[in-house]
Amino acid sequence: MKKYLVILALFVCIQANAQNGKLVWSDEFNDSNISKTNWVYDIGGNGWGNKELECYTNRPDNSKIEKGNLLIIAKKESFNGKSYTSARLKTEGLQNFTYGKIEARMKVPVGQGMWPAFWMLGKNIATANWPKCGEIDIMEHISNTKETVGTMHWDNNGHVSSGKPTPCDVAQFHVYGIEWDAKSIRWMLDGNKYFEGNIANNVNSTDEFHQPFFIILNLAVGGAWPGNPDVTTQFPDTMFVDYVRVYELPGASTSK
């Protein structure tokens, strides 16, 4: 029986790898500290183009690893002229990817004014600027809505976007991801596709999406989309990230 179980486990592992493709990068958040070879911080409280209310910091008060999860913690406190603090981590300058299956297992906060996100920006943002660099929002959730939203942003003689929400109880752990190749970007929730964006042959000026992108994880407070927190919003509140993984899709190449 034990031998059978070992063989079965090996078969399941092989099948999973065949389905996902080759794992090219991951952070399982099993170390005691946040990896400096995987993540850097955006720091400050300039609104980030969205009228956000928080000041992002690199303090352990706002981001840390605990019990195998990355915790991004939004707090209500006076800090550098702002009334809230949180964290925004990114792989910019360390890890960039073109194409692949990119996913994270996460549980995010629900509350008026809360705006957790798992997303990507083009590596060339410093020179091309937004939206010409491209943006892939793998997962966004706002306030008390019972859905997650996947969106792509790019430049086509001005900012354009395409996306779709899908029902989701974000207060529970789910796997959010995209499958991205030269033809399309497919948004996935727990392995099920709910939206697809066509980028084949740079259709509709989507050439941005054939360039390297970096990953971002953040928990914003307030902003033009979710609105401000109110008396019902509970602080501190936490975004939990179990892992982030990047696979090479079968039959396609993922460049770093």
Which stretches of residues belong to each language-model region?
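Sec-dependent N-terminal signal peptides
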Residues: Y4-C13
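Sec/Tat signal peptide C-region and signal peptidase I cleavage site
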Residues: I14-A18
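GH16 jelly-roll
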Residues: Q19-K256
